[in-house]
UniProtKB/Swiss-Prot annotation:
Coiled coil: none annotated. It comes from Saccharolobus solfataricus (strain ATCC 35092 / DSM 1617 / JCM 11322 / P2). It catalyses: 1-(5-phospho-beta-D-ribosyl)-ATP + diphosphate = 5-phospho-alpha-D-ribose 1-diphosphate + ATP. Belongs to the ATP phosphoribosyltransferase family. Long subfamily. This is ATP phosphoribosyltransferase. The lineage of its organism: Archaea, Thermoproteota, Thermoprotei, Sulfolobales, Sulfolobaceae. Pathway: Amino-acid biosynthesis; L-histidine biosynthesis; L-histidine from 5-phospho-alpha-D-ribose 1-diphosphate: step 1/9. One of its GO terms (biological process) is L-histidine biosynthetic process. SUPFAM superfamilies: GlnB-like (SSF54913), Periplasmic binding protein-like II (SSF53850). It is an enzyme of class 2 (transferase). Keywords: Amino-acid biosynthesis, ATP-binding, Cytoplasm, Glycosyltransferase, Histidine biosynthesis, Magnesium, Metal-binding, Nucleotide-binding, Transferase. The gene is hisG. Catalyzes the condensation of ATP and 5-phosphoribose 1-diphosphate to form N'-(5'-phosphoribosyl)-ATP (PR-ATP). Has a crucial role in the pathway because the rate of histidine biosynthesis seems to be controlled primarily by regulation of HisG enzymatic activity. GO terms for molecular function: ATP binding; ATP phosphoribosyltransferase activity; magnesium ion binding.
Length: 290
């Protein structure tokens, strides 16, 4: 019987939906009949999703309870878990910032030197290291809820928290004066995953994930080209779009296949059509496996 591989993913929050969408692009779709289920079978036989708090995922993966996990780079750093970041994903981008009241005259962290203040944060370890490194006279107050409201409540004067656009900070009368680190979603694994009995299956999962990432934003273009137009069509393609060329059963027609980024697709189609290509078909690419 095949042992289930487990992937820990966020059970809620800003990373949950992008994570599920990414996994579906890989071909891993949850099959839970109950939204409250915490261990969920998937469309990929032998692969289960485990719904866990985002901040707990690094520690869970470190123990080996799940083979892989998807979480934020910020939580990997905060947890100090002994895990390996295997794939950097293209969602969940944010910054961890130091924010202070807009009424403060200080606009940089250097201007805070010598000033006593409290800073509320759920990133306790990151904050402690930051305060030490920047030689600030600040007391770190650990919280688990919304940091933005803490200055208004009088629980702290400043916060260290995640920022995507800065809108929430402004809404609460705060301004970011320093970026502590950039964050993004990552696929993580136990340091010993390569020694795992299921290493081949794990590696296949990672390969398919990388393939889905590589395919994002790319389109495959098929076109028929008369023999006397072939050179013109080939020369009209951007240099990076090296095409595959096959002579069809009609000896005077060639099939040309190429791949283009979605943002230059209209330009490519216009050029090849003007050069003599016809019967142009464009399809999505699900994965590019290298």
């Amino acid at each position: 019987m095949v042992r289930n591989l487990k992937i820990a993913i966020p059970n809620k929050g800003r990373l949950q939906q992008p994570t599920l969408q990414f996994l579906q692009s890989v071909g891993i779709k949850p099959l839970a009949s109950d939204d409250r289920a915490l261990i969920v079978p998937t469309s990929w036989e032998g692969v289960q999703l485990v719904m866990i708090r985002t901040e707990d995922i690094p520690n869970i993966v470190e123990t080996g309870a799940t083979e892989l996990g998807i979480t934020g780079h910020d939580y990997v750093i905060e947890s100090s878990a002994d895990v390996e970041e295997l794939i950097k994903l293209d969602f969940g981008r944010s910054k961890i910032v130091l924010a202070v009241p807009q009424t403060w005259r200080e606009n940089s962290v250097d201007e805070l030197k010598g000033k006593e203040f409290r800073v509320a944060t759920k990133y306790y370890n990151i904050a402690k290291e930051y305060v030490r490194r920047r030689e600030l006279n600040a007391k770190v107050v650990k919280i688990s809820g919304a940091a933005e409201v803490m200055p208004s409540l009088g629980a702290a004067e400043a916060i260290i928290d995640v920022m995507s656009t800065g809108t929430t900070l402004k809404l609460h009368g705060l301004k970011a004066i320093d970026v502590i680190m950039d964050s993004y979603a990552v696929v993580i694994g136990n340091r010993n995953w390569i020694k795992n009995d299921e290493a081949d299956r794990i590696n296949l999962l990672l390969t398919m994930m990388k393939g889905a990432i590589a395919a994002k934003g790319k389109k495959m273009i098929f076109m028929n080209v008369p023999d006397n137009k072939l050179d013109g069509v080939i020369n009209s393609l951007p240099a990076m779009l090296a095409p595959a060329i096959t002579r069809l059963s009609r000896s005077d027609i060639w099939e040309v296949i190429t791949v283009a980024e979605e943002d230059i697709l209209p330009e490519v189609i216009a050029k090849v059509k003007a050069a003599g290509a016809r019967d142009i078909v464009v399809i999505d690419i699900e994965k590019v496996v290298k």
